[in-house]
């Protein structure tokens, strides 16, 4: 079962209900809408189709709105493009002009105040590099030297590595797009070109003004300034996207893998989801199979600790959108098999100060690994407990049961968490019982599984204070257990020693009213013993202890409740009998 989440960008190649359904079946968890392209009508139609496809499949698919952000671009060029020659002089004007080989202009007129002589300006994702040689503030012009030849087309991106650019946190377009997203009920805002915490707070203020504070903000780190301010940015954010495209232009390419590892590590420490994005399976826009380097890139992001991996052009405009998702699913699933969960847990358990929820999350992860449980089940109001458990990367899947569909969708970015909708409860016992039932409904948990349940006060977020180890089973009957062992076997019912001698076989569970010394030969074959007669000093109790087999005494009507030949699990520690095979301690 894949735990890494997959984010898919939706575009012309994937916007139909039919194609979206195929993407979801292939493994898409979150749909990304890139607001650098398209209008409200297009994106509104895509959101409608996403919800229709998700509804058909009964899936909770998160929707992520990716803002265009406060970027810098060139204006238009003469005849659509110009040729720039290495060594030539190029003036960058703050006033809009038609671009020529001698002079171009940019959309941000404050650039002249941010750069200095010696600064580097990169055009079109670094295709052409410029070095600032002079600044003429009277003419509002930056004089540069072209570092390498290249063709420059209309409205290309401008990057200024190593320079703190005083662009606004969000533009007017971004604000309008976010308000549209609020009206459409999106789950995440991916904020482009975040440089400082105030950029995130501007968006949070806008969300609060529109009563949408529950929408999560995922800053995209795309420049050196964002990397430098990462700790402060994470304090006010709900997660992070490592946007390696622009980041690789702003900082040297050889630094990108190291920055990726560091950003992921910081998110892991805080229990905040992190998305690794850009060019993960880029060649699959054109080819049905990825390059070996791309497969390694996806795997290494998972080894680094990413919660989610993202597809951009591969699903938005590529020729093989469904195949790209399936490929990413296959690589992620195989890579997860190589994760050393004990090592990860040990490394992340060295945190000194923590909240009660964090402490419970760590304890749950330790218990899950030590007992090799089948699943972790957590009823949750806000999703916080599930995130805190995921932080420690337990091997067992985390089933988060929530009454809030929006919380369920927000957990679609969190590693190892499988959210399902529950219902309101009046007591903790009822909440736990219903959570176990919902986990059974998902198919992740089955009867006989050993699970860990963690929860808090009913209806209150942030109160997690309970952990329970539980066997999910059909409890057939109960009595008084002797010892702490368990056994699985076929039921043999005997009313007396003669019947027992005739029917008993090695490894069976002997069920009888009472035992005596005439039954010793049969008892020596038994995997477990159940009697209707009670008492810690009864013959059955004493003999069972001496033979070292699990015994349950005082089980009323055991010879009529249990059926000849049925398979059961005897748990003497709890004095319980489960139908079929159950995982008990």
Swiss-Prot record:
Sites where the protein binds Mg(2+): 222, 246
Signal peptide: none
Sites marked Transition state stabilizer: 220
Gene3D superfamilies to which the protein is assigned, alphabetical: Phosphoenolpyruvate-binding domains (3.20.20.60), Phosphohistidine domain (3.50.30.10), PK beta-barrel domain-like (2.40.33.10), Pyruvate kinase, C-terminal domain (3.40.1380.20)
Pathway noted in the entry: Carbohydrate degradation; glycolysis; pyruvate from D-glyceraldehyde 3-phosphate: step 5/5
Cofactor annotation: Mg(2+); K(+)
Keyword tags: ATP-binding, Glycolysis, Kinase, Magnesium, Metal-binding, Nucleotide-binding, Potassium, Pyruvate, Transferase
Entry-linked InterPro entries: PEP-util_enz_mobile_dom, Phosphohistidine_dom_sf, Pyr_Knase, Pyrv/PenolPyrv_kinase-like_dom, Pyrv_kinase-like_dom_sf, Pyrv_Knase-like_insert_dom_sf, Pyrv_Knase_AS, Pyrv_Knase_brl
EC number of this enzyme: 2.7.1.40
Pfam families linked: PEP-utilizers, PK, PK_C
Gene Ontology MF annotations: ATP binding; kinase activity; magnesium ion binding; potassium ion binding; pyruvate kinase activity
Binding sites annotated in the UniProt record for K(+): 34, 36, 66-67
Catalytic activity: pyruvate + ATP = phosphoenolpyruvate + ADP + H(+)
Ligand binding (ATP): 34-37, 73, 156
Residues binding substrate, per UniProt: 32, 245-246, 278
Top-level taxonomic group: Bacteria
SUPFAM superfamilies: Phosphoenolpyruvate/pyruvate domain, Phosphohistidine domain, PK beta-barrel domain-like, PK C-terminal domain-like
Quaternary context: Homotetramer.
PANTHER family recorded: PYRUVATE KINASE (PTHR11817)
Protein family (similarity comment): Belongs to the pyruvate kinase family. In the C-terminal section; belongs to the PEP-utilizing enzyme family.
Descriptive protein name: Pyruvate kinase
Lineage of producing organism: Bacteria, Bacillati, Bacillota, Bacilli, Bacillales
Name of encoding gene: pyk
């Amino acid at each position: 079962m894949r735990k890494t989440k997959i984010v898919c960008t939706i575009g012309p190649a994937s916007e139909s209900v039919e194609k979206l359904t195929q993407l979801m079946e292939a493994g898409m968890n979150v749909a990304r809408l890139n607001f650098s392209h398209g209008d409200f009508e297009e994106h509104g139609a895509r959101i409608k189709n996403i919800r229709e496809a998700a509804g058909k499949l009964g899936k909770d698919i998160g929707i992520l709105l990716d803002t265009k952000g406060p970027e810098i671009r060139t204006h238009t060029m003469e005849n659509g493009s110009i040729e720039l020659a290495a060594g030539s002089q190029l003036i960058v004007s703050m006033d809009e002009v038609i671009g020529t080989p001698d002079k171009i202009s940019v959309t941000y007129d404050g650039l002249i105040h941010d750069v200095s002589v010696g600064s580097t300006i990169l055009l079109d994702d670094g295709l052409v590099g410029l070095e600032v040689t002079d600044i003429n503030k009277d003419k509002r012009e930056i004089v540069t030297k072209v570092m390498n030849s290249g063709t420059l087309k209309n409205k290309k991106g401008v990057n200024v590595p190593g320079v703190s650019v005083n662009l606004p946190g969000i533009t007017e377009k971004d604000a309008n797009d976010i308000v549209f997203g609020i009206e459409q009920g999106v789950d995440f805002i991916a904020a482009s070109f975040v440089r400082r915490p105030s950029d995130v707070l501007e968006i949070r203020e806008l969300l609060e003004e529109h009563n949408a504070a529950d929408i999560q903000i995922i800053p995209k780190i795309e420049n050196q300034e964002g990397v430098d301010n990462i700790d402060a940015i994470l304090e006010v954010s709900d997660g992070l996207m490592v946007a390696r495209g622009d980041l690789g232009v702003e900082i040297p390419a050889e630094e990108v893998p190291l920055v990726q590892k560091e950003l992921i590590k910081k998110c892991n420490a805080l229990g905040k989801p992190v998305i690794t994005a850009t060019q993960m399976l880029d060649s699959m826009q054109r080819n049905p199979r990825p390059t070996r380097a791309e497969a390694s890139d996806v795997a290494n992001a998972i080894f680094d600790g990413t919660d989610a991996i993202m597809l951009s052009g591969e699903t938005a405009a590529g020729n093989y959108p469904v195949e790209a998702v399936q490929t990413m699913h296959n690589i992620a699933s195989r890579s997860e098999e190589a994760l050393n969960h004990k090592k990860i847990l040990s490394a992340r358990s060295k945190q000194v100060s923590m909240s009660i929820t964090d402490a419970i999350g760590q304890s749950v992860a330790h218990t899950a690994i030590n007992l090799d449980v089948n699943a972790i089940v957590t009823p949750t109001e806000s999703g916080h407990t599930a995130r805190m458990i995921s932080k420690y990367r337990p091997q067992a899947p985390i089933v988060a049961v929530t009454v809030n569909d929006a919380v369920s969708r927000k957990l679609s970015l969190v590693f190892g968490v499988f959210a399902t909708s529950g219902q309101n409860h009046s007591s903790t016992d009822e909440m736990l019982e219903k959570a176990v039932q919902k986990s059974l409904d998902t198919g992740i948990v089955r009867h006989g599984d050993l699970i860990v349940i963690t929860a808090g006060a009913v209806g209150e977020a942030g109160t997690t204070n309970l952990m329970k180890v539980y066997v999910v089973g059909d409890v057939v009957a109960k009595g008084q257990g002797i010892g702490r062992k368990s056994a699985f076997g076929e039921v043999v019912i005997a009313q007396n020693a003669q019947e027992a001698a005739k029917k008993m076989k090695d490894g069976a569970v002997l069920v009888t009213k009472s035992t005596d010394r005439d039954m010793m030969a049969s008892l020596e074959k038994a995997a477990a013993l159940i009697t209707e007669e009670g008492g810690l000093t009864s013959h059955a109790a004493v003999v069972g202890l001496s033979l070292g087999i699990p015994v349950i005494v005082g089980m009323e009507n055991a010879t009529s409740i249990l059926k000849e030949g049925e398979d059961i699990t005897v748990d003497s520690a709890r004095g319980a009998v489960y139908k079929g095979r159950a995982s008990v301690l």
